[in-house]
């Protein structure tokens, strides 16, 4: 079902050196060159996807510098079978210091030419941007160089946003990353998927936390970007890295030139380690392709201890399972905005290549050649006098070590569960049916195109369309499945409330019901609070993704079946008590009033909300409100409670419950 939305929103013109949205179409072209030194350096290497490798995967011309120092400058050309639209070319010189392609000219089949100067001599990208061109070929002629056998490591060619004809290419994930929260930017995530991975550049929760475009360093790649829940940071390295010194030591510089970020895909280059990191995802797994550009001793770190954006990891338990797999768990504490005091995360990490050895660390101690590890259990309050202080814990984790050669690739898959290690492995096995990274990326982005394409806009400027589809992408982030592929999920509602936290939790494992075809009736979700979503999210979901109000309603009612209360912002099967009132009521009522409620019984949903609108329920009202109709000294909460009562009255009326409709209708005035 497609909807055409006629109103578009404007965005100021901002240029991003990194690529958001569009695809590199150079691999679809045929490469020819004036000369090649040998078969290992022929023209086909210039668009093979191997970039910045030491003396490999590159076009090397046969041009020899004569004694009179006038090099016969070479050229290379890309031809497409049909006309394409281009707006950006990225050139990578050979990383070797013996030959430097310093400048040249780009010639296009439309008769235009663009001069290129200042190409870095270490393989760093040189970005050339221009007004969109319709062309059949592009040719780069060297006009300034040093040394013999100059060439290029790679040429990438990108169309402008929207030219790809899909919806993913309309999204620019970099927009507003300096303002958002930790889970505002998730490129390794499917719509409402369980795994949510992205590079971490600012280790804080709000005001530009998570991935921040203004950052110049990558701290790692966390696999969980949830509302008050984070964890399992992966970080590839090379050389001698002391992990006990933490992310401030193992971090790496990166550049936006050469970076690509899209829904379902992210690529960047770790400058300090010479590693290309590519990331995609399935519903319940993260997937990485690591390309090493030089011979090195490599370590793939898994950090399982310390503060991470919205929570603090500790009590790690890790076990090696053969030479391709690691399993374990860690606890998470310190949710700044409340929630279950402890959420245990189980994980499995699988490698396509056997690691040479597994090392570990806990606090300041390092271990070599281990089969298991117990991390630090120490927790300290960062600000002892603040009730909502973040917590700290020593870093702990393991590192899988490899001896790698130039051009080697290692693939890594991750999966989590909030129930058991066995379930995490089942999630991984169910989703990880191939090591073909490109196939998984295509499937991930096909799914994003289907979701984003539910609302198709026409007209306006490209900037307006980019802003619109980027906003749609954000609407589909921040809420994640917590149930496993077998239907099990954690119930953390049974405990003692302490302010905004739940302590002394009696953890239960529950199983979702299935329909006649064996599919779970609905999923359970971790979600940011639904406070004020009646003005935006409830309406937009109902228009574009009508299954989601139904899904969320069923999930919220099941939370109440487990713990009595309808959550405001559920966390891993428990409550956060964030904000005020019962903001789920307008969402659930809207699903019913629009005829979308299929996955839970409407009468049961109404009675559950009715209980939550009485003293002791999530609405948080007392006898004063029942007697006087307002919240003392709080006009805002009065309006909120009145609106929620009015919404509940509408559902009661449609259900034929005249007394209840009159009661809540009167309460709303």
How would you describe each model-predicted region?
Residues 7-15:
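Bacterial N-terminal signal peptides
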Residues 21-86, 92-100, 104, 118-120:
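Disordered, acidic Ser/Thr/Pro-rich linker "stalks" and the adjacent N-terminal cap
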Residues 76, 124-128, 398:
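Short strand-edge motifs at loop-to-beta-strand transitions and within beta-strands
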Residues 88, 137-139:
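Short, conserved beta-strand segments of beta-strand-rich sandwich/propeller modules, principally
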Residues 89, 155-157:
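Extracellular beta-strand elements of beta-rich domains used
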Residues 113-131:
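Extracellular carbohydrate recognition and processing domains
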Residues 141-148:
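Short beta-strand-plus-loop segments that form exposed binding edges in beta-rich domains
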Residues 161-586, 593-639, 643-669:
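Accessory carbohydrate-recognition regions in carbohydrate-active enzymes
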């Amino acid at each position: 079902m497609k909807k055409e939305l006629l109103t578009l929103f404007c965005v100021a013109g901002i240029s991003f050196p990194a690529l958001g949205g569009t695809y590199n179409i150079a691999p679809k072209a045929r490469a020819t060159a004036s000369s090649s030194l040998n078969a290992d350096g022929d023209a086909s290497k210039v668009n093979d996807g191997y970039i910045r490798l030491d003396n490999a995967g590159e076009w090397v011309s046969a041009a020899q510098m004569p004694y009179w120092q006038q090099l016969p400058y070479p050229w290379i050309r890309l031809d497409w079978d049909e006309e394409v639209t281009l707006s950006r070319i990225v050139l990578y010189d050979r990383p070797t210091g013996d030959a430097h392609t310093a400048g040249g000219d780009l010639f296009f089949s439309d008769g235009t030419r663009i001069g290129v100067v200042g190409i870095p001599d270490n393989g760093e990208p040189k970005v050339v941007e221009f007004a969109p061109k319709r062309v059949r070929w592009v040719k780069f002629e060297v006009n300034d160089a040093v040394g013999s056998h100059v060439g290029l490591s790679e040429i990438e060619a990108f169309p402008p946003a929207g030219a790809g004809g899909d919806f993913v290419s309309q999204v620019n994930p970099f927009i507003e990353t300096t303002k958002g929260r930790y889970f505002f930017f998730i490129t390794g995530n499917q719509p409402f998927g369980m795994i949510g991975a992205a590079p971490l550049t600012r280790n804080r929760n709000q005001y530009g936390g998570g991935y921040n475009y203004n950052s110049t360093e990558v701290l790692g790649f966390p696999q969980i970007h949830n509302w008050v829940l984070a964890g399992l940071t992966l970080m590839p390295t090379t050389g001698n890295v002391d992990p006990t010194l933490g992310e401030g030591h193992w971090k790496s510089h990166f550049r936006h030139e050469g970076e690509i970020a899209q829904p379902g895909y992210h690529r960047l280059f770790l400058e300090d380690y010479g590693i290309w990191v590519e990331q995609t995802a399935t519903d319940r797994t993260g997937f990485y392709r690591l390309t090493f550009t030089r011979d090195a001793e490599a370590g793939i770190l898994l950090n399982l201890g310390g503060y991470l954006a919205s929570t603090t990891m500790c009590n790690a338990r890790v076990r090696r399972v053969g030479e391709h797999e690691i399993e374990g768990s860690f606890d998470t504490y310190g949710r700044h905005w409340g929630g279950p005091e402890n959420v245990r995360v189980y994980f499995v990490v699988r490698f396509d290549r056997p690691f040479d050895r597994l090392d570990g660390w806990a606090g300041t101690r390092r271990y070599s050649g281990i089969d298991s590890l117990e991390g630090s259990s120490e927790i300290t309050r960062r600000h002892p006098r603040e009730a909502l202080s973040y917590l700290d814990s020593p870093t702990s984790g393991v590192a899988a070590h490899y001896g790698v050669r130039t051009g080697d690739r290692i693939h890594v898959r991750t999966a989590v569960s909030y129930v058991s290690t066995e379930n995490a492995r089942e999630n991984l096995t169910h989703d990880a049916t191939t090591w073909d990274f490109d196939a998984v990326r295509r499937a991930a982005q096909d799914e994003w195109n289907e979701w984003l394409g539910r609302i198709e806009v026409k007209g306006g400027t490209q900037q307006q369309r980019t802003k619109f589809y980027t906003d749609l992408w954000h609407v589909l982030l921040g809420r994640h499945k917590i149930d496993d592929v077998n239907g099990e999920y954690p119930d953390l509602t049974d405990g003692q409330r302490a302010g905004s936290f739940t302590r002394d939790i009696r953890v239960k494992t529950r199983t979702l019901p299935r329909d006649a075809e064996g599919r779970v009736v609905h999923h359970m979700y971790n979600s940011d609070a639904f406070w004020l979503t009646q003005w935006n999210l409830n309406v937009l979901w109902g228009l574009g993704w009508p299954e989601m109000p139904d899904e969320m309603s069923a999930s919220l009612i099941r939370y109440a079946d487990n713990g009595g209360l309808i959550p405001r912002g559920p966390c891993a099967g428990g409550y956060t008590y964030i904000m005020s009132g019962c903001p789920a009521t307008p969402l659930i009522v809207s699903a019913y009033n629009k005829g979308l409620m299929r996955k839970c019984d409407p009468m049961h949903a109404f009675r559950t909300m009715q209980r939550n609108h009485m003293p002791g329920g999530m609405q948080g009202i007392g006898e004063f409100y029942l007697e006087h109709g307002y919240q003392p000294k709080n006009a805002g909460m009065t309006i909120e409670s009145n609106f929620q009562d009015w919404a509940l009255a509408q559902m009661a009326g449609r259900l034929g419950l005249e007394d209840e409709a009159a009661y809540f209708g009167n309460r709303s005035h």
